[in-house]
UniProtKB/Swiss-Prot annotation:
Keyword annotations: Cytoplasm, Mitochondrion, Nucleus, Phosphoprotein, Repeat, WD repeat
UniProt entry tagged with the keyword Cytoplasm: yes
Organism: Danio rerio (Zebrafish)
Phosphoserine: residues carrying this PTM: 49
Name of the featured protein: WD repeat-containing protein 26
SUPFAM superfamilies from the UniProt entry: WD40 repeat-like
Oligomer and partners: Forms homooligomers. Identified in the CTLH complex that contains at least MAEA, RMND5A (or alternatively its paralog RMND5B), GID8, WDR26, and RANBP9 and/or RANBP10. Interacts with DDB1-CUL4A/B E3 ligase complexes.
WD repeats mapped onto the chain: 265-304, 311-350, 356-396, 436-475, 478-520, 523-563
Pfam families according to UniProt: LisH_TPL (PF17814), WD40 (PF00400)
Location of the LisH domain: 51-83
């Protein structure tokens, strides 16, 4: 521990299916009665609501895509619905058969059914473009030229595209044409894609948007995923990896809230931990003056001691991996004037940097090019150096608490003793205020996309800021934060989660959108100084504590139901 004096839910798919089945059953009864002798038992045909008609059309479109055309015909006949307007059906068939003149005539019939008649020009342009490309592929250059000059150009639409199309006349063979036009060639594939574009101009009452049912199902699954507190994996957008028969729910047992390992090799307080950018290693720094590099086993995700980096004159309070993970820089506490730059692969010290014995170098950040880094401390030092420790630039009078290099390679963010984060440019020596807090900023980190900053604020806890809009987005509740330096992190799939240590010996995890913690992790017996989430393994997390241990957190072990019920693991849910 380091002291510092500064709506509504989506309908279940099964429910929708039952509703449709009931509606169809009613119509089926009518059909059965109609086929009889006209007796008094003839059932009155149910009048379908607009929503019911829409669902039947969606099902019909989906079945048609599966090739179940007879089933579609029976469904439309029995329900009394129409899958699409008869003019749209003709238009579809003519496009798929490549009968371009007939398809163009069909547009005249569809014009009266469209909300925007001007869209006819755009649709005609797309039709003629396909016609032109198919002529070129067939080697019919004269016919293609006639389409270009006599049909496309008179439309006076998208002249830039016409100039591009004219250049395809110079293609020597069909493969050259396909490559330059980024077009797959004449056939069902390109015509289907053309039809998808054309359908966007037609109202859904005339022709449904392409694959509409799949789109709705995908949206429903994505919404369920977004509402799932513990969702920490990537979903396949094809829907093949999910069940549509049940709502999507992730179990807490799949979340990294169970102790997998307790690393006890340090012999004093552990102040910092950080996974490498490729997720294959973990570096831990301790008050015992050592840095330990741990190897993450790819199959088991167990950590094994790789090497110990020794020789530091002070405890190690901060670590920074180079972008390529070849080097690691170690910093000490306030009274440390040295930086240690290690080659992690060989275990050799490359540079021990010190500008003055009066310096305080407590924070460091790598430039994205991996050839430079910035460092500073609360005594007013703010340097940019190369890999050999040579001073490249300096900024006077900035009392640095924490540093971060932005992805543009020019801007450096620095929190200072004035309770703010400012952006500095060493190129033109300009700076600007980005974040202003009312209490000291003990540490901060930035999301991968550079948009969000996560701050640990003295006596306040964890705050989320939008760096682009320069606004406070959220204050996360639960954590105990005094004037000790605690490091939080983004993590999980798509960085949807936030984790932080706490002075009450716990690790807190929040979903990024929720102020209340979803999980509290207990097990440490003293302040938890730092949490690091593996950037490549969403289910792996590490925490470093003043109790001298590093805990590795992962999903629940494979236990049977009885064992899981009796598991005395230190993971408690905070959702309500």
């Amino acid at each position: 521990m380091q002291s510092n004096g500064t709506g509504q839910e989506q309908n279940h798919p099964a429910n929708t299916q039952n509703g449709d089945a009931n509606g169809l059953q009613s119509n089926a009864g009518s059909a059965s009665g109609a086929s009889g002798t006209g007796s008094g038992s003839l059932k009155k045909k149910k009048r379908l609501s607009q929503a019911e008609e829409d669902v039947i059309r969606l099902i019909g479109q989906h079945l048609h895509g599966l090739g179940l055309n007879q089933t579609v015909d029976l469904l439309m006949q029995e329900s009394g619905c129409r899958l699409e307007h008869s003019s749209a059906t003709k238009f579809r068939n003519h496009v798929m058969e490549g009968e371009w003149d007939k398809a163009e005539n069909d547009l005249n019939e569809l014009k009266a059914l469209m909300h925007s008649p001007n869209a006819i020009v755009r649709m005609k342009f797309l039709l003629l473009q396909q016609k032109y490309l198919e002529y070129l592929e067939d080697g019919k250059v004269l016919e293609a030229l006639q389409v270009l000059r006599g049909e496309l150009t008179p439309l006076k639409y998208n002249t830039d595209r016409i100039h591009v199309l004219s250049g395809y006349l110079m293609c020597s063979h069909a493969e050259d044409l396909k490559a330059k036009a980024e077009w797959e060639g004449k056939g069902a594939g390109s015509r289907c894609r053309l039809l998808d574009k054309l359908q966007t101009y037609l109202p859904p009452s005339v022709m449904l948007p392409p694959r509409r049912l799949q789109t709705l199902l995908r949206q429903a699954v994505e919404l369920q995923r977004d509402r799932c507190l513990y969702h920490n994996t990537k979903l396949d957008s094809s829907l093949d990896s999910v069940s549509l028969l049940l709502d999507h729910v992730c179990s807490r047992k799949q979340f990294p809230c169970y102790t997998q390992q307790i690393l006890t090799e340090h012999c004093n307080e552990v102040w910092f931990c950080k996974f490498s950018n490729d997720g294959t290693k973990l570096a831990t720094g301790s008050k015992d003056t050592t840095v330990i590099i741990w190897q993450v086993e790819p199959d088991t995700h167990q950590l094994k001691l790789l090497r110990t980096l020794e020789g530091h004159a002070y405890g190690v309070s901060y670590l920074a991996w180079s972008p390529d993970d070849v080097y690691l820089i170690a910093c000490g506490p306030d009274d440390c004037s040295e930086l240690w730059l290690w080659n992690v692969q060989t275990g050799e010290l490359r540079t021990k940097m010190s500008q003055s014995h009066e310096d305080s170098l407590t924070s460091v950040a790598w430039n994205p090019d991996g050839k430079r880094f910035v460092t500073g401390g609360q005594r007013g030092q703010f340097y940019q150096c190369d890999l050999d420790g040579n001073l490249l630039e300096s900024w006077e009078g900035v009392r640095v608490q924490c540093l971060w290099c932005m992805g543009d390679g020019r801007t450096v963010l620095a929190s200072d003793t004035h309770q703010r984060i400012r952006g500095y440019s060493f190129e033109d020596l300009t700076d600007r205020n980005i974040v202003q807090e009312d209490h000291p900023i003990m540490s901060f980190t930035v999301s991968k996309n550079g948009r969000l900053a996560l701050l640990n604020v003295a006596t306040q806890g964890v705050h989320l800021w939008d760096l682009q809009d320069r606004v406070l987005v959220r204050k996360y509740q639960g954590v105990t934060q005094g004037f000790y330096t605690i490091h939080s992190c983004f993590g999980g799939h798509n960085e949807d989660f936030i984790a932080s240590g706490s002075e009450d010996h716990k690790v807190y995890i929040w979903h990024k959108r929720s102020e209340l913690p979803i999980v509290e992790l207990t097990g440490h017996t003293r302040t938890v100084n730092c949490v690091s989430w593996n950037p490549c393994i969403p289910s792996l997390m590490a925490s470093a504590s003043d109790d001298g241990t590093v805990r590795i957190w992962g999903p629940a072990p494979f236990l049977d139901a009885q064992e899981l019920d009796g598991l005395t693991e230190s993971c408690s849910s905070m959702d309500s």
